[in-house]
Regions:
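Active-site neighborhoods of divalent-metal-dependent phosphate/nucleic-acid chemistry enzymes
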Residues: 46-49, 60, 71-115
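Alpha-helix N-cap/helix-start and coil->helix boundary motif
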Residues: 9, 41-45, 86
Length: 115
């Protein structure tokens, strides 16, 4: 089972322009094996909000994609963060600090035994 990061989910937005390796991997991996994190959902939401402010027409397209495609596709498979996740995340910063959101996503994957 896999935890998808923002870049993989974003790649699915335009199926006709999706990288062929991503397409092949997604086609051979059943959707029931794909999870994501609340941190990824926050990053996607932040991107949509930014686009809605910058370019309302494109923002509306992204909003529809997020609400009508992504959220339903991951219904029941958006993993939360909790105190256990926080402990795992903190350990990922020692001895060297790591990017915050990436650390939360990695900690979530580790907590749930996902790749």
């Amino acid at each position: 089972m896999y935890l998808l990061d923002t870049n993989v989910i974003s790649e699915t937005r335009r199926p006709n322009r999706m990288h062929h390796n991503v397409r092949a991997w997604l086609e051979q991996t059943g959707p029931e094996s794909l999870y994501t994190s609340v941190i990824v959902m926050m990053e996607l939401e932040r991107g949509v909000l930014g686009m809605e402010r910058k370019d309302p027409a494109q923002g509306a397209i992204l909003r529809e994609w997020l609400e009508q495609v992504i959220k339903p596709a991951f219904n029941g498979r958006i993993l939360p963060i909790d105190e256990a996740t926080a402990g795992i995340c903190a350990r990922l910063h020692i001895p060297d600090r790591a990017p915050e959101n990436d650390s939360w996503i990695a900690a979530t994957a580790k907590q749930y035994g996902l790749t």
